[in-house]
C-alpha cells in the first residue's frame, strides 16, 4: 500500500513538469533568456534538482575529526541517493553513482577544504573524498529526456574561515588548457585541489581532474549512440571546481566520445555561492566555447561570491536570489545562513524576484526544515532545531557483545561499476 501511494505521488509530481521536453532550454541552450525573471517554474525545480545533488556531497561527508574516517564518504555508492534522502518524493533522482572522486593538495589549504582524522589509524593522511560521478538509469533517462552524466563536487566545510586566512594567488593553467591558452590563470587553491596527486595515497595516485575525465569518457563511450548531457554541480569550493571542470571538459573536447569525435554533448554547470575562479583570460577562453553553460545562483547578502575581490573575472549567467525576503528565516541573518546550500535552495524554491517590491512565496513543496540541516537559520516559531543533521547516536552503534563502537563508514572499493 505504501509503495503504491509513493508511486502515485511521484507520478503526480512528474506530470506537472516537462523536463524531458524542455531539457535543452532548462540546461541553458539560450542562456536562460526570459526564464529567470520571473523564474520559470520548471527551471525552479530543475535548479533545485541539481542543487540537491550537490547537497548530497555535504550529507555524506564525514566531518568528525575524531573518526578514523574523517574526510571520507560515510555512504558507499550502493543506494547512495536513498541514504542522503533523495529517493522519497524525488522522482527525477534516478541515477546510479559510478565513481567517487578523491583529491589532495600539494600546497597548504585550510581545513575547511581538506579535513583529516586526528587518529594515526586514519583512513588517509593525504586525500579527501571530493565528490562523485553519476549517470541516469533507464527510467531517469526517459524522465529527463536524455542520458544525463552528473559530476558533483563537494563544497568547503566551513567556508567563511578561508575568506581572511587563505592567500588568493593566481597560477598559470597551461597543464589544463595547453599552450594555445598559456595566458590563462586560475586561483591557486582551486587549481591545486583539481590537479594535485600523491603517490602515497591509493586514492589520489591520479589527480581529481584525471579521475573525472576518465569516468566521464568511459560513460560517454558507453552511451555514444544515445543523446547525452553532462551536468556539473557544486556549492562554494565545489562551485569553483565545477566551473573549472566544465570549462576543462569543453575546451579540451572531453565532451565527445573518442570513437565519435564529431558528436559533442552540451555541458552545463549549476553552481551555488561560487567564488571567482580565474582571470580575464580564463573568461575570454570560457566565452569562446560553444558547448558550455554556467548558471551561477547567488544569494545577494552572501559575501563568498565577491571573493577573491581583485584580479578575477566572473563567467556564465548569474541568477540572483535574496533569502532575506523569506518569512521563515531569522532576521537579521548571518554569514553562515546566507551562504549555506540548503538556504540557497530554500531561496530558489520561494524567490519571486529580488526587487524591493518582490515577495517570497514557496512555489514548490520543499520542507522548510531543510534550511536548518547545518545552520540555525529558521525562526523559532518554525519549531525546527538548528543543525539537526547528525548520524544516529553520532555514529556510535551497539555491537553483538554489548559494546559500543563508532560505525560511520561504508566500505566501497570505488572500482568501476557497470549499471
Curated annotation (Swiss-Prot):
Per the record, the similarity remark reads: Belongs to the AB hydrolase superfamily. Lipase family.
Species of origin reads: Arabidopsis thaliana (Mouse-ear cress)
InterPro entries (UniProt xref): AB_hydrolase_fold (IPR029058), Fungal_lipase-type (IPR002921), PLA (IPR033556)
- GO annotation terms (biological process): diacylglycerol catabolic process; lipid storage; monoacylglycerol catabolic process; negative regulation of seed germination
Enzyme category, top tier: hydrolase
Functionally, this protein is described as follows: Acylhydrolase that catalyzes the hydrolysis of 1,3-diacylglycerol (1,3-DAG) and 1-monoacylglycerol (1-MAG) at the sn-1 position. High activity toward 1,3-DAG and 1-MAG, but low activity toward 1,2-diacylglycerol (1,2-DAG) and 1-lysophosphatidylcholine (1-LPC), and no activity toward phosphatidylcholine (PC), monogalactosyldiacylglycerol (MGDG), digalactosyldiacylglycerol (DGDG), triacylglycerol (TAG) and 2-monoacylglycerol (2-MAG). May be involved in the negative regulation of seedling establishment by inhibiting the breakdown, beta-oxidation and mobilization of seed storage oils.
Top-level taxonomic group: Eukaryota
Distribution of this protein across tissues and organs? Expressed in seedlings, stems and siliques, and, to a lower extent, in flowers.
Which GO MF term does the entry hold, naming one?
monoacylglycerol lipase activity
Which protein, by its recorded name, is this? Phospholipase A1-IIgamma
* Cited Pfam families: Lipase_3
Q: Where in the cell is it found?
A: Cytoplasm
- Positions in coiled-coil regions: 1-21, 207-227
Question: What positions does UniProt annotate as the active site of this protein?
Answer: 236, 302, 339
Q: Look up the record and report any one GO term of the cellular component aspect.
A: cytoplasm
Which region is the signal sequence?
Answer: none
Keyword Signal attributed: no
The record's pH note reads: Optimum pH is 5-6 with 1,3-DAG as substrate and at 30 degrees Celsius.
Query: What does the UniProt keyword field contain?
Result: Coiled coil, Cytoplasm, Hydrolase, Lipid degradation, Lipid metabolism
Q: Does the keyword Translocase apply?
A: no
**EC identifiers of the protein:** 3.1.1.-
Q: What happens when the gene is disrupted?
A: Mildly fast-growing seedlings regardless of the presence of an exogenous carbon source, accompanied by a better beta-oxidation and mobilization of seed storage oils.
Amino acid at each position: 500500500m505504501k509503495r503504491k501511494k509513493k508511486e502515485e505521488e511521484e507520478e503526480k509530481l512528474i506530470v506537472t513538469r516537462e523536463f524531458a521536453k524542455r531539457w535543452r532550454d532548462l540546461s541553458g541552450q539560450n542562456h536562460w533568456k526570459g526564464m529567470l525573471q520571473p523564474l520559470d517554474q520548471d527551471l525552479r525545480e530543475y535548479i533545485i534538482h541539481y542543487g540537491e545533488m550537490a547537497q548530497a556531497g555535504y550529507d555524506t561527508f564525514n566531518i568528525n575529526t575524531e573518526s578514523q574516517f574523517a574526510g571520507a564518504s560515510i555512504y558507499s555508492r550502493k543506494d547512495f541517493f536513498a541514504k542522503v534522502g533523495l529517493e522519497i518524493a524525488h522522482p527525477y533522482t534516478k541515477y546510479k553513482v559510478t565513481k567517487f572522486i578523491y583529491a589532495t593538495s600539494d600546497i597548504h589549504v585550510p581545513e575547511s577544504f581538506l579535513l583529516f582524522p586526528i587518529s594515526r589509524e586514519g583512513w588517509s593522511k593525504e586525500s579527501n573524498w571530493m565528490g562523485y560521478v553519476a549517470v541516469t538509469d533507464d527510467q531517469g533517462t526517459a524522465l529527463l529526456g536524455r542520458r544525463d552524466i552528473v559530476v558533483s563536487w563537494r563544497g568547503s566545510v566551513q567556508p567563511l574561515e578561508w575568506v581572511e586566512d587563505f592567500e588568493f594567488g593566481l597560477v598559470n593553467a597551461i597543464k589544463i588548457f595547453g599552450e594555445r591558452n598559456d595566458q590563462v590563470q586560475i586561483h591557486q587553491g582551486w587549481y591545486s585541489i583539481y590537479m594535485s596527486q600523491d603517490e602515497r595515497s591509493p586514492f589520489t595516485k591520479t589527480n581529481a581532474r584525471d579521475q573525472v575525465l576518465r569516468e566521464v569518457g568511459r560513460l560517454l563511450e558507453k552511451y555514444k549512440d544515445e543523446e547525452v548531457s553532462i551536468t556539473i554541480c557544486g556549492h562554494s569550493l565545489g562551485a569553483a571546481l565545477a566551473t573549472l571542470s566544465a570549462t576543462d571538459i569543453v575546451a579540451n573536447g572531453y565532451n565527445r566520445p573518442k570513437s565519435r569525435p564529431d558528436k559533442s554533448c552540451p555541458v552545463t554547470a549549476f553552481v551555488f555561492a561560487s567564488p571567482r575562479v580565474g582571470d580575464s583570460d580564463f573568461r575570454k577562453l570560457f566565452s569562446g566555447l560553444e558547448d558550455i553553460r554556467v548558471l551561477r545562483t547567488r544569494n545577494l547578502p552572501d559575501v563568498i561570491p565577491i571573493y577573491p575581490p581583485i584580479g578575477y573575472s566572473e563567467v556564465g549567467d548569474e541568477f540572483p536570489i535574496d533569502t532575506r525576503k523569506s518569512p521563515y528565516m531569522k532576521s537579521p541573518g548571518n554569514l553562515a545562513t546566507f551562504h549555506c546550500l540548503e538556504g540557497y535552495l530554500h531561496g530558489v524554491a520561494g524567490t519571486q524576484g529580488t526587487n524591493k517590491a518582490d515577495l517570497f512565496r514557496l512555489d514548490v513543496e520543499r520542507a522548510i526544515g531543510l534550511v536548518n540541516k547545518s545552520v540555525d537559520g529558521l525562526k523559532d516559531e518554525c519549531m525546527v532545531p538548528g543543525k539537526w543533521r547528525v548520524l544516529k547516536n553520532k555514529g556510535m552503534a551497539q555491537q553483538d557483545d554489548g559494546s559500543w563502537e563508532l560505525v560511520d563508514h561504508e566500505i566501497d572499493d570505488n572500482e568501476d561499476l557497470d549499471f
